[in-house]
């Protein structure tokens, strides 16, 4: 489930209380009911006291929050951005998502980017323009550490898949060589990778495997067990 338009920690705390009561009422395992938070108000990013409220929202969820979603258009409108400039790549959007990213780091909470309302519909030129825009925005999100994003139209699914597959395949050979060298099963490379970078490289490969962009046969001396170990 998704909790939208959050403006106060108390709203998250209230949902936690309700879910706990539902688990007791229906004899469910404690903590099994979880939720995602839609970050679509300025108040969910910056509290009146100047603190990053989104970080407090995560901790107020008592481990029930699984993801943060950026809400492109509600957030932009609340910041006073006129319609023609409301976008996933507006500076206000990037600021909000950067705060979300730092707040979620190390918590296990996933991140999801927002959507574009420019749809691939109409004549051939408009469809192709919509696809080009969407593919570029998906690539941009992935480059910035947002592995998921919202789509508003079935016509955006082809570019979602294509951009995601291309992202995880791009540079795969170099990534595999670096991981093999770090794990001690391959030749040394020109990179001096530290544990945190190796974990990020392994995470990228695992995500590529899980979405179908990469086959295990392409990993050479690196196996899933090694990836899991390095990813931690």
Task: Identify the function of each model-found stretch.
Residues 2-232:
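Expand to "…catalyze enediolate/carbanion chemistry for C-C bond making/breaking, isomerization
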